Every structure is written in C-alpha cells, then in structure tokens.
C-alpha cells in the first residue's frame, strides 16, 4: 500500500477542481507506468493542514463584567472552560460548535464549501488523537488573551465566490488587505 501526497499552492482559490484534475492526470500516468497496480482513488483531502489561519484577541477585564473584579472572575472561568475543553471531548464538542457557528456563517456568506471547512476543522481538533477545544485562553496582566488556529482553505476568487451575487457582496465587505500571509 502506497500513498502519494501532493502540496498544491492554489493561491486565493479553493482549488478543489484544479487539484482533482491534477491528481487524476497523475493517476493516469501511474497507470501507464505500473499497469499491474490498482489505484484505489485520486482525490484531494479536505484536511487542509497547510492552510492554517490564526486569530487572537485581548479583552480587558472591565469589558467582561460590570467592573474589573467581576471581569477578572469571568476571565478565569473562560480560561478554565477552555482548559477543560482540551481534556473532555464532550465539552470540546460544544466549545467548538460555538466557534463553528461563526466560521460557517462567514464561509457560507462568501460562497465557500462549509462541509469541507467543517470537516477539516473538526479533524484538526482531533489531530492529537483526542477531540479537543480549538481555543487557547490565558490571563496576562489585566486582560484575557485568546488564540485560535484552524485549517481554513477558503477562496476569495473563483467558484461560487465570483458567481453568486451575495457571495460577491460579502467578499466586498471584507477588508482582505488585513490578511497577513
């Protein structure tokens, strides 16, 4: 049994059709070279580990509650809940569902494949052998600091993003110049 993996830079496109065409061409060439061998399949993986996107935030305690002291208590609970979601897959499922609500809305609004993105992110949450929460929360000084890293293969050109009027409008509202590559 042999698996051959390719890494294709599709730039700002999602590139599924292009990648599958490349893989089919490679499979045909392999069939020519090794006619006695069976090729089970030649298809892309939606587990986009080479397309990681990160977001971070800093929230002052006073923004979390009626005052700084209550905000600090809330920050500590958020941090503890995030740590617990790393240990317990039942908590992680609900923790990540909340994250996915926002991600899937943006993915759908821009005409991207919500199922592909969702599958990739959930696989990433289980990459260490246990399904875990996707966020990291820490207390730094008088702030709650959060970080999220997920595989996010989405398109800003091609496919539905350029055909569907609502997807085009959604992309126009985003300031894509803020993206750091």
What annotation goes with each model-predicted range?
Residues 151-155, 171-176:
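Short beta-alpha connecting loops at secondary-structure transitions
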Residues 14, 19-159:
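Glycine-rich anion/phosphate-binding loop at the beta-strand->alpha-helix junction
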Residues 179-181:
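Conserved small/polar residues in nucleotide/adenosyl-binding loops
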Residues 11:
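A domain-level signal for the structural core that forms small-molecule/cofactor-binding pockets
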Residues 1-6:
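Short, conserved phosphate-binding/catalytic loop or strand-edge motifs used
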Residues 25-27, 170-173:
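Short, well-ordered amphipathic alpha-helical segments that serve as non-catalytic structural scaffolds
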